[in-house]
Amino acid sequence: MPRPGHPRPASGPPRLGPWERPTELCLETYDKPPQPPPSRRTRRPDPKDPGHHGPESITFISGSAEPALESPTCCLLWRPWVWEWCRAAFCFRRCRDCLQRCGACVRGCSPCLSTEDSTEGTAEANWAKEHNGVPPSPDRAPPSRRDGQRLKSTMGSSFSYPDVKLKGIPVYPYPRATSPAPDADSCCKEPLADPPPMRHSLPSTFASSPRGSEEYYSFHESDLDLPEMGSGSMSSREIDVLIFKKLTELFSVHQIDELAKCTSDTVFLEKTSKISDLISSITQDYHLDEQDAEGRLVRGIIRISTRKSRARPQTSEGRSTRAAAPTAAAPDSGHETMVGSGLSQDELTVQISQETTADAIARKLRPYGAPGYPASHDSSFQGTDTDSSGAPLLQVYC
């Protein structure tokens, strides 16, 4: 019985509200086939069901359950962090090159890679057009491969990573002549300048020397007896021997030591003219350039200074000078200045002085001092007490 004030419902299915209407939602994704219609599953009624209703059909609504599962995967690609990860993966090669060249990925790697990529790209494209259909060969290698082989040949076979950089600075600097000029706003850093040579470092073998690649052997005093041959057929070892001769004739051992140790500037100031004359004579006699002559002269000085244990040859001029002025003493540097002086016992003159009257009186003033002095020479010591040594303890004056 309907309540008063309410109309009687019409016969037919009941009308549902807007919140009760079944809605069909469909999410379309790109590059995916359309989904098939939802399947229906039939379930038999439970035999224990007292109502024994007909078979019940269960329909899976796509707008209620399925979108809740698929929406996270569909919207996952549009998350910010996912997009950044994909962008980093796509730009991995460019960012890697930028990190190697600049130390950081700045402005999307455009300052560091714009100039070089454009030049390399045009060169590769031109080479591909010219050699289209031609089989590859070592003579017709692409520009990038040729540059890599040229750089590897200049560096040697032991270093096969020319593009290694430390904090943006290349470990092995590229040649300045072939490297393009960087842009004004580029983030690439200039390579560090070559360190200045050490002050006390030995001179290295000069590349311009015609005998720079030869090996220099040490020599003994027996090598000094080699016959002097012509300058055209003389070897590097024989030239070093002759320089050794000239050094020992021109300078003393002490002066060569000071030249090698660099302890005295006065020696260089006094001997500048002699050293320059010696260098000029070496260059003229042996047909060497000035740098090679200086290097050989320095090596000869150091070789003579470091071979103190062996006897050094003495020239006749040096012996006559030392014999004429025996009182002149060389300045003491504290490093074995008396070794190898060249004086022998045959050159020394031993003189024995004759006894004078003053020497005889002095010997008589010392009792028991002279050998063979008689014990009973002085009678004043008779009858005095003596100790175990026999020397008198008390002198009695009568």
UniProtKB/Swiss-Prot annotation:
Compositionally biased region (Polar residues): 377-389
Region (Disordered): 1-60, 123-156, 307-340, 369-392
Assigned keywords, A-Z: Cell junction, Cytoplasm, Developmental protein, Differentiation, Disease variant, Ectodermal dysplasia, Phosphoprotein
Entry's localization field: Cytoplasm; Cell junction
Principal subcellular localization: cytoplasm
Keyword Cytoplasm: yes
Stretches that traverse the bilayer: none
Start-end of Basic and acidic residues biased regions: 44-55
InterPro entries: KDF1 (IPR028003)
Pfam families the record matches: DUF4656
Keyword Cytoplasm: yes
Residues modified to Phosphoserine: 218
GO cellular component: anchoring junction; cell cortex; cell junction; cell leading edge; cytoplasm
GO terms (BP aspect): developmental growth; establishment of skin barrier; keratinocyte development; keratinocyte proliferation; limb epidermis development; morphogenesis of embryonic epithelium; negative regulation of keratinocyte proliferation; negative regulation of stem cell proliferation
Known outcome of mutating residue 312 to H: In a colorectal cancer sample; somatic mutation
Protein origin, superkingdom: Eukaryota
Signal peptide positions on this chain: none
Disease implicated: Ectodermal dysplasia 12, hypohidrotic/hair/tooth/nail type: A form of ectodermal dysplasia, a disorder due to abnormal development of two or more ectodermal structures. ECTD12 is an autosomal dominant, hypohidrotic form characterized by sparse hair (atrichosis or hypotrichosis), abnormal or missing teeth, and the inability to sweat due to defective development of sweat glands.
Database matches in PANTHER family: KERATINOCYTE DIFFERENTIATION FACTOR 1
Its biological purpose: Plays a role in the regulation of the epidermis formation during early development. Required both as an inhibitor of basal cell proliferation and a promoter of differentiation of basal progenitor cell progeny.
Protein name stated in the entry: Keratinocyte differentiation factor 1
Gene name per UniProt: KDF1
